[in-house]
């Protein structure tokens, strides 16, 4: 359920996450995230043009957490790890309706920051 964070998320990200959550429900899966720790957040890119529609800021997020998926019916872990792992992600913020909101999260090894 994304409702707890909707005021911080772009309309596009809410739609994408709700779609993914819907597929997880069909597959009888549920995400589990535990012991989430933010270790560092560093801005790596900013773009500001007249108007708001193209403004964006990208942060490199370094964190540590336990993240896995369980089968809703059995409680069995179906993917992921039940031990803590370090992660690096790019978090892309955009201006939408006059405020900054999270629009995209990409894994560091999936993308060249210049292409974001």
Q: What annotation goes with each model-predicted range?
A:
Residues 1-46:
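Core segments of small alpha/beta cavity-forming domains
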Residues 50-116:
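Exposed beta-sheet edge and beta->alpha loop/turn motif
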């Amino acid at each position: 359920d994304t409702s707890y964070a909707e005021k911080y998320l772009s309309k596009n990200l809410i739609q994408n996450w709700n779609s993914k959550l819907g597929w997880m429900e069909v597959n009888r899966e549920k995400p589990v995230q535990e012991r989430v720790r933010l270790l560092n957040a560093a801005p790596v890119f900013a773009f500001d043009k007249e108007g708001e529609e193209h403004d964006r800021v990208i942060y490199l997020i370094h964190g540590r957490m336990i993240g896995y998926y369980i089968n809703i019916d059995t409680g069995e872990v179906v993917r992921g790890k039940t031990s803590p792992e370090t992660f690096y992600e790019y978090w892309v913020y955009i201006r939408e309706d006059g405020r900054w909101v999270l629009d995209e999260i990409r894994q560091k090894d999936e993308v060249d920051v210049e292409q974001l």
